[in-house]
Curated annotation (Swiss-Prot):
GO terms for molecular function: DNA binding; iron ion binding; iron-sulfur cluster binding. Gene3D superfamilies: Winged helix-like DNA-binding domain superfamily/Winged helix DNA-binding domain. The keyword Transport does not apply. This is Probable [Fe-S]-dependent transcriptional repressor. InterPro entries: FeoC, Tscrpt_reg_HTH_FeoC, WH-like_DNA-bd_sf, WH_DNA-bd_sf.
């Protein structure tokens, strides 16, 4: 089980990462990582970076049946 400090340190070392990458690297369940990232965000230590839907090269994101599931959400330190 990872700690809040380990999540922060990993973001410091890697720059920006997705929650799934952090979960896999630290061998911690993703819901726990999501909660830790939200805590870091509320403390002003981390920032959420979301891709814009206009970044889709094929233009098929708007009609995607998964509804923006292809858009990535990154996390980085402030």
């Amino acid at each position: 089980m990872a700690s809040l400090i380990q999540v922060r340190d990993l973001l410091a070392l890697r720059g920006r990462m997705e929650a799934a990458q952090i979960s896999q690297t630290l061998n911690t369940p993703q819901p726990m990582i999501n909660a830790m990232l939200k805590q870091l965000e509320s403390m002003g230590k981390a920032v959420r970076i979301q891709e814009e839907p206009d970044g889709c090269l094929s233009g098929s994101c708007k009609s995607c049946p998964e509804g923006k599931a292809c858009l990535h959400e990154w996390w980085a330190l402030r």
